[in-house]
Amino acid sequence: MDGIVPDIAVGTKRGSDELFSACVTNGPFIMSSNSASTANGNDSKKFKGDNRSAGVPSRVIHIRKLPSDVTEGEVISLGLPFGKVTNLLMLKGKNQAFIEMNTEEAANTMVNYYTSVTPVLRGQPIYIQFSNHKELKTDSSPNQARAQAALQAVNSVQSGNLALAASAAAVDAGMAMAGQSPVLRIIVENLFYPVTLDVLHQIFSKFGTVLKIITFTKNNQFQALLQYADPVSAQHAKLSLDGQNIYNACCTLRIDFSKLTSLNVKYNNDKSRDYTRPDLPSGDNQPSLDQTMAAAFGAPGIMSASPYAGAGFPPTFAIPQAAGLSVPNVHGALAPLAIPSAAAAAAAAGRIAIPGLAGAGNSVLLVSNLNPERVTPQSLFILFGVYGDVQRVKILFNKKENALVQMADGSQAQLAMSHLNGHKLHGKPVRITLSKHQNVQLPREGQEDQGLTKDYGNSPLHRFKKPGSKNFQNIFPPSATLHLSNIPPSISEEDLKILFSSNGGIVKGFKFFQKDRKMALIQMGSVEEAIQALIDLHNHDLGENHHLRVSFSKSTI
């Protein structure tokens, strides 16, 4: 890792980690004032630690080159997107810290992620690596008491024990967040494309429960006030999102704590919303934010669906910057710059590159762990085509469990990766990452290929041929319920049930739309069955010049 020394170079490394290693090796770690001064001043003695190699995963993570004025809360916030932080050791004299995650998997995810995205605290890049030891034990010195109080405050809020969090925060924990407001003031600079209240909600809700949002224009700048359920979430969001762009080279977030401690929302509409009061009126005279802004900027309209619509990821999804790093069930797993699905869909609809993503312009995906006996270019074209216009597909000739899928642009590739990674296809969970290739090469004339490479650049089955297509507003994660459209009048419910059970799947529910019988919902026995049915039956000829359209539904029957 560039700029990072090994965690323990046996017999050669000296300093705070050496001291830490020696103490842990000999028993529970006790950082007394004497040993602290040793760590800060006496580096002369050689030390032989255990011989675990430097890159071996551990629950304990070593953080170096911290700013001298860093708080416990800021250090803890580095681990929050990846899981629960269970212990913290601050070595401020050395500008270092150790944090312990609740699982080795969470720690591994964190280290892998920060390997590709250098974290910055107070404008200073910091360095993260595995520690040489599996467990962190601390004493009750004043420094560690502050660290433990900070941890208690964060973990109490995460577990919903707000009363305990308040009492813990009342202790002088050295956390900046302890006395701060749960309300953030957000300014969006360089507003080239409209940013809606719903896009803000979906971005910021990854860091905690958003209670209220008010948007307004002041000094010719689009601004928002956003209230979290607790100050810890506000601190976490500010640290992660301040200075980031929502879209490529524009819509920069500037975030500060508001002097207000609570927001008073009178109307639920496009300018303000109280998520705790769905009964509030819309306010007839309140102008629609997305319409007025879209008109003012002449930009493609950013989707303004329900804040809950399309926001769910499958149980396993990829943090884009980590090139498809899989994060199972991470609470608040939106890492810095990761754009939620609805905002990504908005970007894709306007052909906007999502900023800050490793290979944001790369439209080629590497799909692995495929079933080589069953996968075909056509099946991948149909499945990935739910999230964008697939240009080319190549199943690797000598490794048929791997394929390259080229989308129309990087935003569509991000959408497909975030929604499909980890889902089962032909009985195997697929793994999706960004490829190092910039495009998929067609085979040369006379080159053996066995039909494993297909060019779909001019396919009539592309769902998103027009920039700003409304189909981008109907992109949802794979689910057991499918949305059917373009059904001719002669086709009955029974006909469709028979059709969808013909590939071995079980139909558990069906209903036509009341107002439009050309559309219906059908529920399969599992998400995997629904994925297979979509692949098999999208564009199926129903007669009378009607070809069935199949997509994943946000609704259930």
Swiss-Prot record:
> Phosphoserine: which positions carry it?
16, 141, 459
Give the GO molecular function terms. mRNA binding
Q: Which Gene3D superfamilies does the UniProt record give?
A: 3.30.70.330
RRM domain: which residues? 59-143, 184-260, 363-437, 480-555
Q: Tell me where in this chain the PTM Phosphotyrosine is found.
A: 127
Organism domain of life: Eukaryota
According to UniProt, the name of this protein is Polypyrimidine tract-binding protein 1
Recorded source organism is Sus scrofa
